[in-house]
């Protein structure tokens, strides 16, 4: 049976578990996958460019699961009431091809991107760091600030946009 995960579902998970748990648990999953990076069958993203934007397909797999992310970038979309970036993806069983999950990946990617940055900072920053600079305050900035707060204890932000 294929599960459908919507943006509302992801938001509800964050609300129910709380952002601290979501960010710290997600960091553990991201780290576990980085540690087994060589096990993944990776290829370069496939991009389809047009005069109005780009659509990219990003596949990856290991011996058990195949997944892809479909993401667009269309800068003029807000003029039509659409998001500049929208993403969805699928997860399937390699042995049978059975689709296990169809998921929104716009909000999920924002969470994962922030956690990946916090993971890198955890490895590179001084352990006593409590201040962060954010240059650019677009859609991703809030997720970055939250991940750095919950994962690294950042309590002071300097922002510039």
For each feature predicted by the language model, list its residue ranges.
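N-terminal ligand-binding/catalytic initiation module
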Residues: 1-109, 116-118, 125-128
């Amino acid at each position: 049976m294929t599960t459908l995960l919507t943006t509302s579902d992801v938001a509800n998970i964050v609300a129910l578990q709380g952002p601290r748990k979501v960010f710290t648990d997600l960091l553990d999953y991201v780290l576990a996958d980085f540690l087994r990076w060589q096990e993944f069958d990776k290829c370069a993203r496939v991009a389809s460019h047009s005069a109005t934007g780009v659509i990219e397909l990003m596949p990856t797999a290991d011996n058990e699961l195949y997944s892809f992310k479909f993401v667009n970038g269309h800068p003029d979309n807000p003029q039509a009431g659409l998001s500049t970036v929208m993403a969805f993806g699928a997860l399937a069983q390699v042995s049978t091809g059975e689709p296990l999950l169809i998921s929104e990946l716009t909000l999920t990617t924002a969470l994962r991107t922030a956690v990946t940055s916090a993971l890198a900072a955890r490895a590179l920053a001084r352990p006593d760091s409590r201040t962060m600079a954010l240059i650019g305050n677009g859609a991703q900035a809030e997720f970055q600030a939250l991940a750095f707060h919950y994962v690294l204890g950042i309590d002071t932000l300097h922002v510039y946009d």
